């Protein structure tokens, strides 16, 4: 029986992107690979994962997708029921054919996949779309091995966590928010803390990172699970080659505006500040105005992604002069990989979601980190302290937001005085591309995983032959 891997991402832009790229990479290694998407995404956006195949299942929201759910909790509840049934039906339909699945790789938040896989007798491997460091914190906190420090000691002095398994000491504010408390999304916090609770030392867990970037944390994780970094799962030119003209994951759930690239073409090399806070976060009107005024004060041309739902947060007329003169461009969504690859971009103001952080590192773009919640505070800490590839904005304690002066300071620190961070970002770009190039650290880890799935398929074949249940048309 030939190996056939079923890849199951969470149906959101930030989770789909790396797993689509992973499916492509796995299929390029000669392993039959099928990526699962939802009926809604298949109908409205489409997914190109070639040479991997794509199948659609129900998530219980076939007409409107995630946006049609009343809440995150309601979406996940319906998705668990509908997707479990739909995925099981897909597996069963393939079981008696030469295309039966021999392994499942699933987003580590999609924990409903595990009982489906067990009932089908198929090994299931979690794929983390977060950094190794954030994943480690969630695992160690969830298992009671690492304590989050209190807000303040009795004398008012802050305390730090102890170093543990490759993790450095951290302030409470640097922890991923779900490790501190559930906040407004208790169901997501619960999923975060138990992502790898079932994994033992010999169980595979795949990470969208690369060994050179997080070597100490990865070494620590290997004491608890078979952790392997197989990223960055980003469409990248390999080391020593130029960029490609069109860079895309192949799963655009939003609609990027091509005007971005034409506008960037008119700007000098390294002159533009690119601003985007991802596909989920909403800043609010006051924070949006502070960022806008900070950008204007810094004086660099800027390209800012403001989603349609957030356009009303921008004060009326504030950026009219800048946009009319060509000093600023506001778009609802951008082709981010192409923007980061453009020579005009000199820095990236980012919320430090993991995809955005890893993309910036992989394209050598220094960052201004304005983290908001979940994994972002820890990513921002590492951008500044562990990787020296950017500066971290400090939130004003009284105002509870990033003020315009701090935004201006950070942009100037990177754009005007950022030789060191540009050099560090360039180093990480080179190492990221080397990691996924033939023989690189991530490429070797992916080869190791390919050996695992092929060996498992061979063992399943032997068992089926011994039981006299060889499927028609199967191949060794």
Label every model-predicted segment.
Residues 1-476:
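Glycosyltransferase specificity loop/lid
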């Amino acid at each position: 029986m030939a190996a056939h891997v079923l890849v199951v991402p969470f149906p959101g832009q930030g989770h789909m992107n790396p797993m689509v790229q992973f499916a492509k990479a796995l299929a390029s290694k000669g392993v039959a690979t099928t990526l699962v998407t939802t009926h809604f995404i298949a109908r409205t956006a489409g997914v190109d994962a070639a040479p991997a195949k794509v199948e659609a299942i129900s998530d219980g929201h076939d007409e409107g997708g995630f946006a049609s759910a009343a809440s995150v909790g309601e979406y996940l509840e319906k998705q668990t029921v509908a997707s479990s049934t739909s995925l099981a039906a897909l597996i069963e339909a393939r079981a008696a054919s030469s295309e039966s699945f021999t392994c499942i790789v699933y987003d580590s938040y999609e924990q409903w996949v595990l009982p489906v896989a067990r009932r089908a007798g198929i090994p299931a491997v979690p794929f983390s779309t977060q950094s190794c460091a954030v994943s480690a914190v969630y695992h160690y906190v969830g298992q009671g091995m690492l304590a989050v420090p209190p807000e303040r000691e009795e004398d008012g002095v802050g305390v730090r966590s102890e170093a543990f398994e490759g993790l450095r000491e951290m302030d409470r504010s640097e922890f991923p928010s779900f490790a501190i408390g559930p906040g407004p999304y208790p169901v997501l916090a619960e999923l975060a803390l138990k992502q790898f609770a079932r994994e033992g030392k010999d169980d595979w867990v795949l990470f969208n990172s690369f060994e050179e970037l997080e070597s100490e944390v990865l070494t620590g994780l290997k004491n608890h699970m078979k952790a392997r970094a197989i990223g960055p799962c980003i469409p990248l030119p390999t080391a020593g080659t130029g960029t490609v003209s069109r860079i895309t994951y192949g799963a655009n759930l939003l609609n990027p505006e091509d005007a971005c690239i034409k506008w960037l073409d008119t700007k000098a090399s390294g002159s533009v500040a690119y601003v985007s806070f991802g596909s989920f976060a909403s800043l609010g009107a006051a924070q949006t105005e502070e960022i806008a005024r900070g950008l204007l004060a810094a004086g660099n041309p800027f390209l800012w992604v403001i989603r349609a739902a957030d356009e009303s947060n921008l004060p009326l007329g504030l950026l009219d002069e800048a946009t009319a003169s060509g000093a600023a461009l506001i778009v609802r969504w951008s082709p981010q990989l192409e923007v980061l690859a453009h020579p005009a971009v000199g820095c990236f103001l980012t919320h430090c979601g993991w995809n955005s952080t890893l993309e910036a590192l992989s394209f050598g773009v220094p960052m201004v980190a304005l983290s908001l919640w979940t994994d972002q505070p820890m990513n921002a800490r590492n951008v500044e302290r562990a990787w020296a590839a950017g500066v971290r904005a400090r939130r004003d304690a009284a105002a509870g937001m990033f003020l315009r002066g701090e935004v201006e300071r950070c942009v100037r620190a990177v754009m005007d005085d950022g030789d060191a961070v540009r050099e560090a970002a360039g180093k990480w770009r080179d190492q990221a591309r080397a990691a996924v190039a033939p023989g690189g650290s991530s490429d070797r880890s992916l080869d190791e995983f390919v050996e695992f799935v092929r060996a498992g398929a061979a063992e399943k074949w032997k068992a089926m032959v011994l039981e006299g249940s060889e499927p028609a048309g199967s191949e060794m």
